[in-house]
């Protein structure tokens, strides 16, 4: 079951979080309505808590895309010429290229990456 967050573009971060919590509780308790579980265009799935580092998410028809959020792991990174530990997370995605151009899909994923790397931007742009 995938609860559907409607009008996400019109919500601020706090309203989005509240609605996600409400929908998740309705789905877990079996009280979600048919309307709350259908009509979506994109799914965000998280296999990170199950240990997924790299996944290949499958689009839920008739949606146009799915984005998989994977586990955060510590990896070596170079900072100032030194190798240092850095937390890193892979995003996996699948897009229906009959509907979404690959370049547009890549820009979308890069935008998500940018916001996750600098979360303060979420508040600045709201």
Task: Please describe what each predicted stretch is.
Residues 1-126:
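C-terminal catalytic/motor cores of large multi-domain enzyme assemblies
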């Amino acid at each position: 079951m995938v609860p559907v967050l409607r009008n996400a573009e019109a919500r601020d971060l706090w309203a989005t979080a509240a609605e996600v919590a409400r929908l998740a509780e309705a789905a877990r308790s079996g009280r979600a309505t048919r309307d709350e579980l259908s009509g979506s265009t994109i799914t965000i799935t998280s296999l990170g808590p199950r240990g997924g580092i790299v996944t290949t998410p499958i689009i839920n028809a008739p949606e146009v895309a799915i984005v998989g959020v994977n586990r955060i792991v510590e990896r070596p990174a170079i900072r100032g010429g030194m190798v240092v530990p850095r937390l890193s997370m892979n995003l996996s995605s699948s897009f229906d290229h009959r509907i979404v151009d690959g370049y547009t899909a890549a820009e979308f994923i890069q935008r998500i990456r940018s916001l996750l790397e600098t979360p303060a931007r979420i508040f600045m742009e709201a």
